[in-house]
């Protein structure tokens, strides 16, 4: 009996610690968003003396927004940069899109690389290798095909690249688009994702996604260059780790990494979340414990039980009140990341928020059930530590 009581006291203590940690994350991310995001960065050096940047753009396939997204990179207001467009397959329709833009912007230093170079199992690295090997500037900007920018995006990122900074990254977010699937994505990338992403970076944990990353090429070369990360599927995590291990700091751009894919659906979003969860579980096994208890409904039940055990409060009343507070703070977070008026109603937000929160356990269990992932037309079996092997169809 004494052992059971001790276990219950321990669980109650855990519940209160969880409460403090999660709400610190809420406050940290909201305050950081208000103070840092969507602000004009201070110019650290004269415009004419900004260092050159090599933009590496991995492309595969075409969606309705691809040409408009790509065109924003040809219209950057930056004194010295090159655009290196990378397409793996010779019959990829993205090649025609690239050629059209190369013809439209002859004054932009841009080249097209077709065929890639097989150096490992990561298809993105394989696609980028030829461009990386001939990149002529000291700063490398790897940016996904679905990202769109505004004219001063690169200037903002380079201004964050101060003396001891080795990597500048953008907080992933989603552009305003039509349909409920777009709303669901926007709610996730404006609430749950920035709460974890920002609070991790504020407290010193290196949390980086590779959607838009500006890095020092010499530091990457010291780590073995891009080829050193071809054995991983989550190459962005391991590149960031290699840079941090060499004593360099990270900085976050004041502008978000604006995803604007023209192809999206609820099933695509769900598959993406499952794939990301599988990668996190294999890279960071502690995710198995930490991730489920950091989500609203599970956390509210644990904390509600702790409050009932200590204060005899009604669990369901506490659960509902805690979820309501979470819901409100998430809306504040979302408005901060958006930096303006949302394109959907509060009712749309409420429905999308509830569905997203309800999906979390299914996503997590699905990730545990099957250790293989499908990505860029390939299938891979993940191994502990983040490496993977390609599954070849016989």
UniProtKB/Swiss-Prot annotation:
Changing residue 89 to G: In strain: Wistar. Changing residue 193 to N: Inhibits activity to about 20%. Insensitive to the inhibitors DEPC and PDMP. The gene is Ugcg. This is Ceramide glucosyltransferase. Keywords: Acetylation, Glycosyltransferase, Golgi apparatus, Lipid biosynthesis, Lipid metabolism, Membrane, Sphingolipid metabolism, Transferase, Transmembrane, Transmembrane helix. It comes from Rattus norvegicus. Changing residue 235 to A: Inhibits activity to less than 1.5%. Residues 33-195, 305-309, 370-394 are cytoplasmic. Belongs to the glycosyltransferase 2 family. Changing residue 322 to R: Abolishes activity. It is a multi-pass membrane protein. A motif (D3) lies at residue 236. The active site is at 236 (proton acceptor). The chain crosses the membrane at residues 11-32, 196-215, 288-304, 310-328, 349-369.
């Amino acid at each position: 009996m004494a052992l059971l009581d001790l276990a219950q006291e321990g669980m109650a203590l855990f519940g209160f610690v969880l409460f403090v940690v999660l709400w610190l994350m809420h406050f940290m991310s909201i305050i950081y968003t208000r103070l840092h995001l969507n602000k004009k960065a201070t110019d650290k050096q004269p415009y004419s003396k900004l260092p050159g940047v090599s933009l590496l753009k991995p492309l595969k396939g075409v969606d309705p927004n691809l040409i408009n997204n790509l065109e924003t990179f040809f219209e950057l207001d930056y004194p010295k940069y090159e655009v290196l467009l990378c397409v793996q397959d010779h019959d990829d329709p993205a090649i025609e899109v690239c050629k059209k833009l190369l013809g439209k912007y002859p004054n932009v230093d841009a080249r097209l690389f077709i065929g890639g170079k097989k150096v490992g199992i990561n298809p993105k690295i394989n696609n980028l290798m030829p461009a990386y090997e001939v990149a002529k500037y000291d700063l490398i900007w790897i940016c996904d095909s679905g990202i769109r920018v505004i004219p001063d995006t690169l200037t903002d990122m380079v201004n964050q690249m101060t003396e001891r900074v080795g990597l500048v990254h953008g907080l992933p977010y989603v552009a305003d688009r039509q349909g409920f699937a777009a709303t669901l994505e926007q709610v996730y990338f404006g609430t749950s994702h920035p709460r974890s992403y920002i609070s991790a970076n504020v407290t010193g944990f290196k949390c980086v996604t590779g959607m838009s990353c500006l890095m020092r090429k010499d530091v990457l070369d010291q780590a073995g260059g891009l080829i050193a990360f071809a054995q991983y599927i989550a190459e962005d995590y391991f590149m960031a780790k290699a840079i941090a291990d060499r004593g360099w700091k990270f900085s976050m751009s004041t502008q978000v990494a604006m995803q604007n894919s023209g192809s999206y659906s609820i099933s695509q979003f769900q598959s993406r979340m499952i794939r990301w969860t599988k990668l996190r579980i294999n890279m960071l096994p502690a995710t198995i414990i930490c991730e489920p208890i950091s989500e609203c409904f599970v956390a509210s039940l644990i904390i509600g039980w702790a409050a009932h055990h200590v204060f005899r409060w009604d669990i369901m009343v506490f659960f509902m009140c805690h979820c309501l507070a979470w819901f409100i703070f998430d809306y504040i977070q979302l408005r901060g990341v958006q930096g303006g008026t949302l394109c959907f109603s509060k009712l749309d937000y409420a429905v999308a928020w509830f569905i997203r929160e309800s999906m979390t356990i299914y996503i997590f269990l699905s990730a545990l059930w099957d250790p293989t992932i499908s990505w860029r037309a390939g299938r891979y079996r993940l191994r502990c530590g983040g490496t993977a092997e390609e599954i070849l169809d016989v």
